[in-house]
Amino acid sequence: MTSEVQTPECELFELELLGGGMERRYRRARPEVEAMPWGTLDPRPFSEAVLVAARRSWTSAAFQEHRTAAACAATLRALISARAPLDLIAGFARFPLDEVVHVELCARMAMELGGGTELWHEPSALCADADPSLSPLLQATELVTRNFCVGEALSIPLLHGTWLRATHPLPRAILGRIVRDEAAHGIFGWTFLDWALPLLPASGPSLIRRTAELTIAEIHKLWAEVRRRPPLAPSDGHALGWMGSEEYLQLAARSLQTRVLTPLRDRGIQLSSAFTSGP
């Protein structure tokens, strides 16, 4: 989580590369990072207000991808503890690396615009763990529901919509790379549930419903923050890689219905009406 008030637990969100052999192996594993058209974006045509908003947006995106990497790592451990099918685990195992790549892409995009903005966070609250009193299978179910059936499933159409609207080659290439990686993330939750549901105890569907509702409640809070943002000219936003607030919220509402609520209903999970409406 981020914090506007700096408490003793808060740390500045900063990133670094170790370099040397570790970086070379990383570059060989994911050469697409260096293949981006870095250095092609001239920030001078944009107003200071637009640039600051863009830097803040991409810094926040880097932090959110950092959080998602932590959530992926926690979910991977839960899948292994639950003895999920080996091919399911193997397919998932690349997701943490995908997210680390996305962290670097977003952070470097912020640097292209003049540098990241100050962001304080509590490392101990980076991502939520599963309820330790649950069985390994139910812990995995809780994390997959939160992070993939809701979180990743909802984020992918929003990323895709932003990619479609990005007009400059650099943010368009970055968003395109993220969208391609996230395609597998978006379907994983449903693949897992199709395997796990027949194995879950009677309390399993209720756990899925409660977890989805709590996650959507947090997303509704984020949407309320988006609604309060001052509007920027759509052309400016599109060039640097984001949507206007109203456009974003409309797409978010549609995506919640089609990418989250409908697949849950198809599997017999019906959420309370308070969680089925858009922003």
Please name every model-derived segment.
Residues 1-279:
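Non-heme di-metal
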